[in-house]
Every structure is written in structure tokens, then in C-alpha cells.
Amino acid sequence: MFKSGFVAILGRPNVGKSTFLNHVMGQKIAIMSDKAQTTRNKIMGIYTTETEQIVFIDTPGIHKPKTALGDFMVESAYSTLREVETVLFMVPADEKRGKGDDMIIERLKAARIPVILVINKIDKVHPDQLLEQIDDFRSQMDFKEIVPISALQGNNVETLVQLLKDNLEEGFQYFPEDQITDHPERFLVSEMVREKVLHLTQQEVPHSVAVVVDSMKRDEVTDKVHIRVTIMVERDSQKGIIIGKQGAMLKKIGKLARRDIELMLGDKVYLETWVKVKKNWRDKKLDLADFGYNKKEY
């Protein structure tokens, strides 16, 4: 008997949702950084064994939006509640329950689907503090299970996955066993470039960046995959930061991104990077759609 199911990973920004998904999948599906709101789109991670398939949906961190992009991200996250049988509500062990958590809990109660509370980053707290966190959240909602983990170190992750397997119902194998995500290679390439921008820049720059893959094709002469990407920013000053002195920052972004893209594609890559200014794109719906933040997602 084959069993399958869809599982959403929900929570505030920076609680470790993407780290968890990447650990379960055994490779990078979702980009990671220490910046809030790193994940902007829903990312599917397809975990398949001989007898089960769990389709994880990693979601943007739920926050109080200040732009049209923020609205898109939050609605995209909540839309998964219509698509899944189980929700993993992830919270950090080293932060007390806040208004953001309470807001999510109210939406989860209204959704009327099983919710597993996942308390991440247990490696950062004393066991007594963890017990306080468990008691506090337990008083707010009737969770199906409460599972403390460390997604970074892998502590208890297998236990959580086994719990999900045990609760799967008989179902179809929705995706081939060798497919690990629903996103095309172009999307993954753009995300890998954006990840390097997030790692290398500060303040408002990371949040103001979108990456568009203009072209991606094999060069018959060099036998490399030739990729041209454009990094979009909102202001000229941000463009200057991305390019850097004598182009040094842009070269660094390109070098680090190319390495990851080559690992993903298993191929040699020539990566061409450009930077353009598109003023206030985060509040323009047409620009959002052009850059891959489309309402079709929800």
C-alpha cells in the first residue's frame, strides 16, 4: 500500500522553515540567509520512499506586510492551508510567543486541519526554557503533536518525519521518485543568485532585490550552460552597492552563485550578471508578476 500527503510548513520569518526542508531533502531546495523574509514563494520539496511520498510546502515567513510584495508573500503562505492535510507550525525555542505567533494560531484554528507544533532551535536553549515554551503554546491551541527539533543540527528531524509518515493515508504517488521540487531550473537559478545578494549585502538592499533569468541555454562552442540574469533593485544607490567598487561585489555574487548553480545542474556554467533599477517595484503589481511573484500562486 502506497501512502501520500501534503504538508505545509508555516511560521514567522527566520524560524528555520527552509533549513528544515533542506535537511529533510538532503540537499538545497530553498535558499537560506539570516535575513527575514528570505523565502518569497511557496517552495515544494518532494520526499519519496518506496512506500510513501510527502509533499512539503515551504512558505514565506508570515509578517505584517508593508508592501504589495509583502501582501503576496503572506497570502501565498496562508493559501497552503487549502492545499494540505497537515500543517507544521514552526516556532523558535529561543524566542517567546509573540503577536505574530498568535495571529497565525487564530488562522490555524479557523482552518480546522491537524497542526503539529515544531519548536526549532532547541540547541540554543536550556531544557527548562524549552518546557516553558511547550506549556505556553499548549495553552493556546490543541496541537496534534508537539515536536522539539534542531533543523540545523538534525536533532529529532527523523522523528518528526516518521511521525508524518505514520499519519499518512493511502494515496497516489503524485510525482516521480526522482523529482524533488515543482519549480523549474530557471527559478532555482534566480533564487541562488538572490541568496548570494542576501548574504553579501545589508540594510534595505536585500529586501529590494529581485532576480530575473533572461536566458539559459547551452553554448555549442564551449559546451557550457550560458545563463544571463538581471538583478533588479529599486534605487540607483542600491545598484551601486550591488556592483561595488570596480565591479568587485557583482563579481563576487556571480562567482559564488555560479558554484552553486553548477552543483545543482551538474554542468559547467557561464553566468552573466547585470543590474537594473526598477523604481518601487515591490509596490507595482505588474512588476511583481514579471519578477515571478504572481497571484496565480494562491
UniProtKB/Swiss-Prot annotation:
Q: Which GO cellular component term is one of those annotated?
A: cytosol
The superkingdom of the source organism is Bacteria
Entry-linked Pfam families: KH_2, MMR_HSR1
> CDD domains this protein is in?
Era, KH-II_Era
Keyword Metal-binding belongs to the record = no
Q: Which residues bind GTP?
A: 11-18, 58-62, 120-123
Q: What is this entry's stated membrane topology?
A: Peripheral membrane protein
Sorted keywords for this record are: Cell membrane, Cytoplasm, GTP-binding, Membrane, Nucleotide-binding, Ribosome biogenesis, RNA-binding, rRNA-binding
Q: Which cysteines are joined by disulfide bonds?
A: none
According to the UniProt record, where is the region G2?
A: 37-41
Q: Where does this polypeptide localize?
A: Cytoplasm; Cell membrane
**InterPro entries cross-referenced by the UniProt entry:** G_ERA_dom (IPR030388), GTP-bd (IPR006073), GTPase_Era-like (IPR005662), KH_dom-like_a/b (IPR015946), KH_dom_type_2 (IPR004044), KH_sf_prok-type (IPR009019), P-loop_NTPase (IPR027417), Small_GTP-bd (IPR005225)
For region G4, the annotated ranges are 120-123
Q: Which GO terms describe its molecular function?
A: GTP binding; GTPase activity; ribosomal small subunit binding; small ribosomal subunit rRNA binding
- Annotated Era-type G domain ranges read 3-170
One Gene Ontology term from the biological process aspect of the record: ribosomal small subunit assembly
Which parts of this chain are annotated as the region G1?
11-18
Q: Where is the KH type-2 domain?
A: 201-279
Query: Segment G5: which positions?
Result: 149-151
**According to its UniProt entry, what is the function of this protein?**
An essential GTPase that binds both GDP and GTP, with rapid nucleotide exchange. Plays a role in 16S rRNA processing and 30S ribosomal subunit biogenesis and possibly also in cell cycle regulation and energy metabolism.
The entry sums up its family as follows: Belongs to the TRAFAC class TrmE-Era-EngA-EngB-Septin-like GTPase superfamily. Era GTPase family.
Q: What is this protein called?
A: GTPase Era
User: What species was this sequence derived from?
Assistant: Streptococcus equi subsp. zooepidemicus (strain MGCS10565)
Query: Upper lineage ranks?
Result: Bacteria, Bacillati, Bacillota, Bacilli, Lactobacillales
What would be the name of the gene that encodes this protein?
era
